[in-house]
Structure formats: structure tokens, C-alpha cells
């Protein structure tokens, strides 16, 4: 009975968080002040037939796995095929072509789909595009941070919310801007994509590679800022892995620590281990909690009830998550599009 009571209370809390009484219009919260839901590996055809359907889903985060293919010098999108594409992205760059063209395309086509979809939905809620660089960048093959930025900028242009937008000409680092809560409101981010970069599983297991995506892109941001070119950067690197306290201090050189304001780790590790996650909301950092289903009491990783999702959202909002993710692609847009007040 105690568990059921707690569940009911959390569901009620979730409803209260998003309700607006009568005709009152609540002020739009900042991006850093809400908790939303994302879909793990949304590029997989088993989750959505087309990438545009993933964009339709209402989810606030969609994930792409990307390989830097040094043989063809192309960005491949696949879970485990570094030299091929295996995904739901189409060869389509016009709205009329979506939901009908050949799939299994490269990253450029995934971005083309996003640009076409954006024309149909110019006021969509902000969407974080989480890019796992499976084997890391390959600068020697012309597939490094500069080339990634160029591709994203070419395909999506002003629809990307960039690090320079957070700096706003007023702050000398992303850390300083985040601590000042310089994030825009969710309304101001309508029609925008926000790119998050994380190291990949192949990269992490490669004994010959100790210079991972997060550090490489952190160096990239630092150097662009020093050169007066920070406006070229298109993504936010994330500190990967749940930790207690500030994980930047033990992982990065002091010169790049201030360029990390995204953090990404396992929800159960954060919550069940009793970590003090208030650190993230106090500093207005973006905290992505993955595998949200696994927090005790565990729920389905694929198709929990709507009430279970609402309760999990409320619980992890209280634990200071910005976005919670799982494989909940079967849920409706009204569920995946839920927005709660953070912390």
C-alpha cells in the first residue's frame, strides 16, 4: 500500500507540474528549469520507421549513433556497422519527400530530414540531438570537430542552438553562462535543435585511443573561443557517466573544464547510489539521466503505462534531471512530450 500511495502521489505531482489553471498563461520556464523525456537510439528502424516519425514523437531528446568512416570519409549512422548505414534516415531534403524515400542514409541525410521536418513544424519544442560518436572523431581522415560543425551548420543553419548562443557575448565560458542561468526560455527555443556529443562504446574500449570525443570537442571549444571563432561550434560536449560531485575535476585539464555544462549518466546510478544531484540544478547544468526505467522500482524499458511514465518523470525531476531517457518509443506524443518542473 505504501508503494501504491507513493506512486499515486508522484502521478498527481506530475499532473500538477504541467497544469495551467483556467485561461491563465504561465511564464515560459527556462530550458534549465524543466525535465522532459527522450528516446534512446531513435534512429533504429524498429523504433520508428522513419527518422521524421521520431521527430514527430514529441520526445525532447533523440539519439544518433555515428561512425567516422575513414575509408569513404563519410559520417555513418549505425549501431554496429562502422562502414555502412543502418537507420531510419531517408534520402529526403524536402518536406514532400519525408515518410517515403529510401532509408539507411548517412548523417547528412538525417540532418536533411530534420531541416525538411523543421519547415513543417517551425514552432516545435526544443529537441536535443544526442550524438554518440561510436569510435570517436577521425581528424586525420577529415572527419573531426571542424568538419562536424561545418556539416551541421550547412544542413541546419540558424535552427541550431549553439554554444555561442549561451555565451551571448557576455560570458567567457559555458560554465559561467550556465551558473548565471543564461539559458533561454523553452518558448525562445521553439524550432531549435541542441546537439549533445558523447564518447562512443567502441572508442571507450579501444586501448589505442585515449583522446575521446568529449575531450577533443572540449579542446575544440576552448580553441575556437580563444581564436574569436566560437560561433562556428555547433554542439555541447557532455561529461559521460554518473558520478558524485563534479566529475570534470578528475577527467579534464583545467583549461577545458569550463566548456562542459552537459552531463550524461545512468539514472539508477545517480539516484539509487544517493548521489547529490542538486549540484546540477544549482549550477543550471543540463543533466541527462539514461535508462530511466531502471530506477527502483523498475518499470518496463519499452512500454510502461502512462501512469508509470508520469511517476518516473516526477521522481527524476525531483532528483534534478533535465531529460530522462529510455526505449519508450511506443508511447504517444502526449506522453513523450510531457514537461515537468525540475527539482
Where are the regions that the model predicts?
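Secretory targeting and sorting signals
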Residues: 1-26
Amino acid at each position: 500500500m505504501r508503494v501504491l500511495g507513493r506512486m499515486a502521489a508522484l502521478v498527481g505531482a506530475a499532473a500538477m507540474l504541467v497544469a495551467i489553471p483556467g485561461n491563465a498563461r504561465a511564464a515560459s520556464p527556462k530550458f534549465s528549469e524543466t525535465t522532459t523525456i527522450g528516446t534512446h537510439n531513435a534512429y533504429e528502424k524498429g523504433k520508428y520507421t522513419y527518422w521524421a516519425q521520431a521527430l514527430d514523437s514529441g520526445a525532447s531528446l533523440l539519439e544518433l549513433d555515428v561512425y567516422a568512416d575513414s575509408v569513404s570519409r563519410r559520417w555513418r549512422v549505425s549501431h554496429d556497422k562502422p562502414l555502412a548505414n543502418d537507420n531510419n534516415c531517408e534520402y529526403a531534403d524536402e518536406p514532400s519527400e519525408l515518410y517515403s524515400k529510401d532509408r539507411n542514409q548517412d548523417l547528412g541525410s538525417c540532418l536533411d530530414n530534420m531541416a525538411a521536418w523543421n519547415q513543417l513544424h517551425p514552432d516545435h519544442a526544443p529537441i536535443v540531438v544526442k550524438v554518440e560518436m561510436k569510435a570517436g572523431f577521425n581528424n586525420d581522415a577529415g572527419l573531426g570537430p571542424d568538419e562536424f560543425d561545418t556539416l551541421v551548420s550547412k544542413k541546419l543553419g540558424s535552427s541550431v542552438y549553439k554554444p555561442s548562443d549561451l555565451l551571448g557575448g557576455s560570458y567567457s565560458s559555458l560554465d559561467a553562462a550556465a551558473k548565471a542561468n543564461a539559458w533561454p526560455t523553452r518558448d525562445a527555443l521553439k524550432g531549435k535543435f541542441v546537439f549533445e556529443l558523447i564518447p562512443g562504446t567502441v572508442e571507450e574500449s579501444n586501448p589505442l585511443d585515449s583522446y575521446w570525443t568529449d575531450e577533443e570537442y572540449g579542446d575544440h571549444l576552448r580553441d575556437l573561443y580563444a581564436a574569436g571563432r566560437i560561433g562556428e561550434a555547433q554542439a555541447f560536449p557532455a561529461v559521460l557517466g554518473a558520478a558524485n560531485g563534479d566529475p570534470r575535476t578528475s577527467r579534464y585539464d583545467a583549461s577545458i573544464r569550463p566548456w562542459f555544462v552537459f552531463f550524461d549518466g545512468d539514472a539508477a546510478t545517480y539516484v539509487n547510489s544517493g548521489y547529490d544531484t542538486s549540484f546540477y540544478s544549482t549550477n543550471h547544468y543540463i543533466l541527462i539521466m539514461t535508462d530511466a526505467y531502471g530506477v527502483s522500482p523498475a518499470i518496463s524499458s519499452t512500454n510502461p503505462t502512462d501512469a508509470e511514465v508520469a511517476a518516473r518523470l516526477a521522481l527524476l525531476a525531483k532528483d534534478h534531471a533535465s531529460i530522462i531517457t529510455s526505449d519508450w518509443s511506443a508511447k504517444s506524443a502526449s506522453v513523450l512530450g510531457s514537461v515537468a518542473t525540475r527539482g
